[in-house]
Amino acid sequence: WKQNQTIKSSVQDSQKIISLNCGIGLLELNLDQEIVAIDEKRYQIDDAKLNAKYLKKENVTFIAGDLDSKIVTYAKKKVYDTLIIQNERYGLSDTIKDTIKIAKFKTIIYACQSHSTLAKDLADLEKNYKLERIIGLDTSCHNSYLTTIVKLVRK
């Protein structure tokens, strides 16, 4: 809940959002902007679509598929001002990094549980983006994970 509220407050000025690793869409269904939410796990996208239907949320499009190919497809179709990345441990692929450079998102919100992965990806992203805010959240009191949420803005 804390993570979703923190991200929600960071995208208030956004109009169109792409969200990667959306899971069952808990964050995306709490936002009012136009959103394309992508996850590789079809069963989670199926649940997200059911939740959207039940909640009558028509602003979110949930897509199941390979993150690399889907972000390229959607970034070419329309201009999005914000990218949300919810990453547990794995870093961003070269395809996603290249798409970020080409799409020129105004804002990137990156939530990650692996500090080494986050540091590596930030080193690449900081070539075109400025670190505006970093927040650490204890999102699970029963383990030692700390979720770090970073807000980057285009230079």
Question: What does each of the following model-derived ranges do?
Answer:
Residues 1-155:
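Rossmann-like S-adenosyl-L-methionine
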